A protein has these predicted regions:
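Conserved N-terminal substructure of TIR/SEFIR domains
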Residues: 1-60
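Conserved TIR/SEFIR loop-to-helix hotspot centered on a Trp-containing motif
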Residues: 63-73
Length: 73
């Protein structure tokens, strides 16, 4: 896994989905919830696994991101 993308769901359409798709098209293996999570997966376990396996992390900082409580995790 090359890159883990952390973001607020409100930022998906405008920024995160296009970013993740572009990185994949360039050959990077990206952990992005819409690419990685499957029906019935534990979100927390999947995130923990993605974080532990990714070489790099990308945090999309926005007002929406900071309004969430989970960034304190």
């Amino acid at each position: 896994m090359d890159l883990f993308i952390s973001h607020a769901s409100e930022d998906k359409d405008l920024l995160v989905r296009p970013l993740a798709a572009r990185l994949r098209s360039l050959g990077y293996e990206v952990w992005y919830d819409e690419f990685t999570l499957r029906l019935g997966d534990s979100l927390r376990r999947s995130i923990d696994k993605g974080l532990s396996q990714a070489r790099y992390g990308c945090v999309v900082l926005s007002e929406s991101f900071f309004a969430k409580q989970w960034p304190q995790y």
